[in-house]
Amino acid sequence: MQVKRRRPSTPFLMWSLDGWTVELLYQSTKTDKKGHSVTTYTNRLTMVVVLDVFNDYPIGYAVGSHECPELIKAALRNAAIHSRELMGEMLRAYQIQSDRYAIKTMHDLYAVMGGKVTPAQAHNAKAKPVEPYFNHLNTTYCLLCNNWSGFGITTNPKRQPNSDALNRKRHSFPDEVGVRAQIDEMMRLERKLKYEAYVQGAAKLKDEHRLPLSRETYLLNYGAETGFKNVLEGCGLRPTILGVKRDYDCFDLTFRDHASERWTVKYDPDDLSQVLAVNVDGSRRYMLEEKYVQPMA
């Protein structure tokens, strides 16, 4: 007898995460070793989706050239940011399900965004609710585009787009920027269609299942870095973030006891009011507030 599963009763109870090679072709021109420009038309991008299986709402996603730990991290970061946009604060999932790609490396990062981490059973696509969702995206959105590549190499050839027709249309394929815009629009429409039901469901989330993600934890695991180390000055830390010199300080007086430390500054590009300062070995962390610099006149 086949086992059946029902969906969670509210959002944020279970997220399912996986990567997918988006079935949209784009053209790319590169220079070969002989200095000649060579254009290829069979390029595709990879998208990692964090899916809330309450109503298949894409709570987070990221697009890149191939699936890798950094792309997964970007998708989880997007999920954290979007949860704040929806709920007013960053929330974690009660349970997060992933595939087994780099599971030893990624487990701790998954644990940041999920109270429980459940790797899916190996070689069983039905174990992951996100797998059928990719087919939904392919048939609902990608199929309508003139650069649609089909259903994958294992599909019946009769269901695939005509290769001669694709070849004739190849010069009209978008470049990488264009296909990224197609993917972003696809995900925007998905969120828009499911937003109302998702928010209504989230209002019923029980307190014991509501897991806030602290600002410090978010910055420590997903924050961007300046690429430089900063030392404490009389006015605090003065890192250059996004090309602008900014002033930060801390109300914790023990911060001043570590004047000899060199600090890495982690920040959220969308909210620079607070940053996290971490020393070289990670043993000390301080949340810093941006200082108001008063004009002289």
Named regions from a protein language model:
Residues M87, L91-E216:
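Globin-like tetrapyrrole-binding proteins
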